[in-house]
């Protein structure tokens, strides 16, 4: 569950193809839900990009081994040429900007909400903050289709949309728990 990517898909395929491997049944859930499933023993492993402290708080009392899989860049999906000149979370408060958010519980949303809090920015000042997409692909699609000016997600997804540019913000770590 949790996040998915080409690298993760390859790993899961190798695990199930191994002579001593078991079939891998995958469920796409946000980071909070997949860790909840792990905590209540409805899942055996979880892929997540939440930070280590968040992971440990969501599965208290359960011994975990975290396997660091890879780092990847996350940032803003914007129209080609970045006409709104978006470069930071502060720019999301511009009244001309309409944001497409991720759903509560996704690592992107958790990171963004934490960043807004650190910078003292109220979500009420961000037009579209309550608009939620369930994946990076759907949030990038919203910008591509001009339903929003900006969304926050993984750099790799921007490559699927020739009319989008990507503005990097930070790197996230993918873990297997």
Model-assigned labels for residue ranges:
Residues 1-33, 39-43, 58-63, 84-89, ...:
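N-terminal hydrophobic or amphipathic helices and topogenic motifs
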Residues 1-4, 90-110:
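Short loop->beta-strand "edge-of-pocket" segments that line small-molecule binding or catalytic clefts
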Residues 10-21, 102-104, 108-129:
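Ligand-binding cleft/hinge of the Venus flytrap
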Residues 32-46, 132-148:
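Short helices/loops that flank or line small-molecule/ion binding pockets
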Residues 44-45, 52, 64-74:
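Short, glycine-/small- and polar/acidic-enriched structural segments
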Residues 47-59, 140-170:
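A ligand-binding cleft/hinge motif common to bilobed small-molecule-binding domains
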Residues 68-75, 159-177:
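Periplasmic-binding protein-like
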Residues 69, 78-99:
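Flexible hinge/capping segments at coil-to-helix
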């Amino acid at each position: 569950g949790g996040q998915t990517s080409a690298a993760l898909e390859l790993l899961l395929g190798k695990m199930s193809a191994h002579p001593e491997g078991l079939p891998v049944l995958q469920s796409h859930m946000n980071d909070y839900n997949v860790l909840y499933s792990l905590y209540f023993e409805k899942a055996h492993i979880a892929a997540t990009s939440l930070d280590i402290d968040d992971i440990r708080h969501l599965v208290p009392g359960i011994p975990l081994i975290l396997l660091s899989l890879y780092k990847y860049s996350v940032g803003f999906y914007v129209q080609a040429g970045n006409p709104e000149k978006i470069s930071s979370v502060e720019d999301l408060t511009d009244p001309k900007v309409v944001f497409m958010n991720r759903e509560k519980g996704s690592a992107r949303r958790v990171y963004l909400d934490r960043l807004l809090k650190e910078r003292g920015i109220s979500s009420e000042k961000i037009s579209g903050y309550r608009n939620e997409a369930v994946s990076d692909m759907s949030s990038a699609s919203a910008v591509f289709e001009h339903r929003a000016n900006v969304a926050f997600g993984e750099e790799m997804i921007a490559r699927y949309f020739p009319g989008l540019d990507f503005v990097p913000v930070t790197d996230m770590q993918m873990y297997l728990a």
